[in-house]
Amino acid sequence: MAGFRSLAREVRDPHHDLALRRYSLRKCLERFAPYGHRATWDHLCARHHIGPEDRAPDPARLVAALDELEEARTVWLAYEAEFAERRKREKHAGLRRPGPFDDWHRRTWGGCGVVWCADPAVHPSWPLAEVLRRLISALRSDPAACCPVCAERSIGWSTGAAPEEWSGPVCTRCGILVPQPVLTPAALTGARKGRHTALASVA
C-alpha cells in the first residue's frame, strides 16, 4: 500500500494523466485528513477551485491543494512527535496512568479526523495548517469555554450523526468536533444540555 509521500509524488508527476493525479490526491486523504476524508476533500476543492467531480482538474490547482495538505501534515506530525516524547518521559518517571488527552490522541493518531467535521460541507475555511496550529495551541493551554479554532462560545453536542467515537461537543459555527480536554467542565455541561443546531459555513 502506497504511503503519503509516494502518493504525493504521483500527484506532482507531470507524466501521469490528470485523472490519476487527482486519484492520488484523494488517496492521500486516506493517510491524512484532518476534517475526515469527505470534509477535507470539500475544503481543498473549495480553497483551490477544483470541481469535486472534475476528473481532469488544473494540475497547478492539484499541486496547490497538495501543498496545503502537506504543510498541515508536517505541523501535526511534529506535534505528535513532541507528544510521544513527553509521554515517554512521563512513563519513565512512573506516570503511566493515561489521562483524557491520551485517549483523544489514541483516536486521532496520524491526523485523520483530528478536527473531525461530521457534516462534510461545514468546516473551517482557513488553511489546514492554521487550523491545526490553533488546535495545538489549545491542547497546550488550560481548558477554555470556546471553540479552539474559531473562538465560538456556542457549543452543541453531536450524537448519532457520526460514528460513535466521534460523538461529542461540536462548534455550532465552524462545525468541528471539539476535543473534550480543551473545554472547561462548565462548557461541556452546557454543550450536553444544549441542542445541536444547523451549522453555518465560516469564512
Can you describe what each PLM-predicted range is?
Residues G175-A191:
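Short metal-binding segments enriched for Cys and/or His
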Residues R38-A64:
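Short, charged early-sequence alpha-helical segments and their helix-coil boundaries
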Residues M1-F32, L128-E130:
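Short terminal alpha-helical segments
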Residues R12-L20, Y35-H37, P52-A56, W116-H123:
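Charged, low-complexity interaction regions
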Residues R140-A144, G168:
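Residues immediately within or flanking Cys/His clusters that coordinate Zn2+
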Residues C147-C150, C171-C174:
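Short cysteine-rich clusters marking metal-coordination/redox-active sites
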